Amino acid sequence: MAFFKLFGVVCRCCSAKYRELWLVCERGNDARDNGYWFYRYLKEKHPEINVRYVIETDSADRAKIQALGGMVPRGSFFHYLAYYCADFLIGTHVQPCAPDLILFYHLAGKGIRARGKQVFLQHGIIKDEMEWLHRKNMYVDLFVCGAKPEYEYIRDTFGYPEHVPQYVGLARFDNLI
């Protein structure tokens, strides 16, 4: 991991490809939910943003990402490098865009994290207690909420600083319009 962190610093200095990078992902094997719709929005409406999407090369959804451009093969050398270079790690799961979710979850618990701001898009509206999403168990810089009651519940009970949970809606809802 230290190698990739160090190599990431060098790449950010030497290549614009790795500067101001936004990395988006869902589970790593699909592109159908909030991660995909957010990515598509950025590619179509904000082409000035250096954004890439992490997905497995044998995914049934790979063609959708390739059509938009910016595919990062999950688990590849480029994936590790992009993970450590990214300014924003945006995903629908814990440890957004991590090359190995379990490993990076445990490393984060010990304070070893990637440099990028972590954005948790999530999949849907939280209505029940989910202790693993509390601040003491998960580090995120932005926790996207899709409904006002959900936002209030997370804000009041999950232990995050006031600026972390934000009521902005879910990206996939935009596809319904």
Where are the language model's segments positioned?
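Membrane-proximal basic amphipathic "stem/tether" segments
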Residues: 1-28
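Active-site and donor-binding regions of nucleotide-sugar-utilizing enzymes
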Residues: 20-177
